[in-house]
Every structure is written in C-alpha cells, then in structure tokens.
Amino acid sequence: MIRWILSLLIILLTWTSVTGTGLAQTQDNPPLTEEQLEEGQSIAKKAIAATENGNFAQAETYWTQLVETFPSNPAAWSNRGNARVSQNKLEAAIADFNQAIELAPEAADPYLNRGTALEAQGKYDEAIADYNRVLELNPDDAMAYNNRGNAKSGEGEWEQALTDYRKASEIAPNFAFARANAALVYYQIGKTGEAVKEMRNLVRKYPMFPDVRAALTAVLWNIGQQGEAESHWVAAVGMDNRYQDRDWVKNIRRWPPQMVAALDKFLNLK
C-alpha cells in the first residue's frame, strides 16, 4: 500500500519551507513569485482530483509539472512516484522516491512508497529495509507494519507477517486491510476457526469489503458451508469481479497459497 500526500495544505507548506530557504539563496533557484505559487496550487488541485478519480496517467502529468516548477519539493516527487506505481512504472517510480528521499531523508512517506514499489518487483528484503526505516522514523506507523507483513508473506515468513499485521491492527483498530491480511494468514497456517471468526467480524463491520467477502467464500466452501459461501460470493463479485481471476488474486492481490487453493476449489466447484 502506498501513501499519498493529498492534503493541499501539506504540499504548500512543504513548498514554503523549501522556497523560503534553500531555493531563495541561490542564483540557480531564485525566489518563487506569488504567481508561481498560485499556479502550483492550481496544478496541485488538478493532480489531487485526477488521483482521487483513478486517472493516474493524468495525475502523473500534473505531478511532473509540479516537479519541474518545484524541483526541491519532496512531496511532488513522492506523489509522482505513487502515480507511476499505480501504472506499474516501477523503475521510474523508484527513481522518483530516491529523489524524494535525497531531498528529505527524515521523511517517512518516500521510504514507505519505495518499499511498495520494491515489493511489487519481488525485492522483499529491500522493501523490508525501507519499512524498517519508516518504523525507525515513526514507530507507530500502522501502514509500515502492514506493508512489512506483506513483504514477510512474500518470503513465506507467515508467523512474522502475522505479528506485523496484529501490530498494525493494534495501532489502528479500524485498519481493515491489516485485519483482513491477518485473517488470510490464519488460514494459511491452519488456524481456520480464527480465520473464519475474524472474517465474519470484518464482514459485519465492513459489509462492502469485497476482499473479505471473497476470502470468506473460499474458506466456507472448503469447510462445507456452501450456501453461505455462495451468498458472500454474489456480494463480493458484485463489488469487484477481479476475484473471479485466480491469477489476479495470486499475483496482484497476493493471497497466501492456501487461500488461493481454497478459492480455486470454489471456482472449479470441487
């Protein structure tokens, strides 16, 4: 999971802190005018709107304009990296995160986002190193724990992953994806009862959460509760039909192997 800096106030404050110091003190980087700042504000609004609408290619174009106008702004670089991750432009995204980290080595978000890109490349050790750095900077970063759990899952370190997911849920009790990930791992390590209990709790609290509906379908089908499994499936695919695609579930959503196998049995009516 990546983290966007979508608060216009935060972006503008970052610009102010940069333009009021380093940029203002060199001939190569003259002070920005009020007109430039207003134009930047307008572009940032467009970038945020495009991001919220899922138009990541357009968002990338806007963030590029901001990077060119405000090259010392780490938030602009990090957000363009996120737009590129969302389009699977992973190497270009990592280059952007590297630049953001160079500009702001004590900022947590670029490390978190670079970790996500590295994880998508299967570079789990490097991703974990970035998540560890986030936790050095902010020991209570729930998303860093969740993401590190994802990377640990990628390495097959299920107990370590479960510890991270639990920690993320402890820090942020409403972090539904961390709880869902923990439930998936419960099933992976043979704790089916705990998996079902957590999935049912999540469905009650978040009835529009397709990942948990699909997971509960797979688990219930495999323990002989076909009727309830079917009802959850109708709800799940009604919200997100990608769960019908085993390859997507395995390689993009990255469910644990036992969960993928359970879903496969359901899809093939075994």
Task: Locate each region found by the language model.
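N-terminal leader/linker segments that initiate helical-solenoid repeat arrays
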Residues: 2-6, 13-70, 270
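Conserved structural position within tetratricopeptide repeats
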Residues: 61, 65-68, 99-102, 133-136, ...
